[in-house]
Amino acid sequence: MSKFLIAIVEDDRHLLVALESLLESAGYEVLLYFSGEDFLVSDRLQDINCLISDIGLPGINGIELLRVVHASRPYLPVIIITAPREPALLQAAMDAGARKTFVKPLDSAALLNAIAAIQ
């Protein structure tokens, strides 16, 4: 059986590496991308089991990425993370189809629980 494959789209390299370490130590396979465009041109959308994306990305933002992803894979679980504590932004992510939203700094245990719940 193949591992649960998670794509992470995050422009903060330190957070990206920290998330990679956290998820790999929990047994997940991880793909890393620095922008929504990098992810979309990677041709891995059909392979992943979950997408974790920041909202504040250069170019296409996380909410726009979520909409593009759900246009071809409407049931793919997407977790959105963001720095600003703006309820309207988090609500927009949920309205666009995010399964869960998290505000930075991330609670590692809560993130792992959210991923476990969607497996």
Model regions: which residues?
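Two-component/phosphorelay signaling modules centered on CheY-like receiver
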Residues: D12-L31
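Short amphipathic alpha-helix used as the core "switch/output" element in two-component signaling
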Residues: I63-Y75
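C-terminal output helix
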Residues: A88, L106-A116
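Acidic catalytic/metal-coordinating carboxylates
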Residues: S35, N61-E64
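The short loop immediately C-terminal to the conserved phospho-acceptor aspartate in CheY-like receiver
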Residues: I55-G56
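Acidic, metal-coordinating helix/loop segments flanking the phosphotransfer/catalytic sites
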Residues: L32-C50
